[in-house]
Amino acid sequence: YRDDMRHSRSFFRIYVEFDEMSVLKPLYTTVESFGLQVLDTILNNPRNTGNYNAILSIKNPEDRAHEQVAEYLKKIQGVRKVKLIY
């Protein structure tokens, strides 16, 4: 069980709501500026409304500050909502 616990802390997920697809690039750039890597993105565009949301799975080798990353993502133009998923 100990290995499973260690593995689960090696990545985290962030839910993001945003206005348009062009916001994805600055999201990735911001995550990477923390020395982290986006492993996976689950993207939704509910009913083609232009209200996009994504769940980013982020590799977190040194257990960095999730909250700090989330705060920076909130500052990106076009981002409406950011939520950490534990």
Where are these regions (language model features)?
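Canonical alpha-helical transmembrane segment with a positive-inside/aromatic-interface signature
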Residues: 1-43
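Short N-terminal micro-motifs specific to bacterial/archaeal maturation
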Residues: 15, 57-60
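Helix N-cap motif at beta-to-alpha junctions
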Residues: 20-21, 59-64
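Short amphipathic alpha-helices in soluble, non-transmembrane regions
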Residues: 26-32, 65-77
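Conserved short beta-strand edge segments in small beta-sheet-based binding/regulatory domains
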Residues: 37-43, 70, 74-86
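A short beta-turn/loop motif at secondary-structure boundaries
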Residues: 44-49
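Short, hydrophobic beta-strand segments
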Residues: 50-58
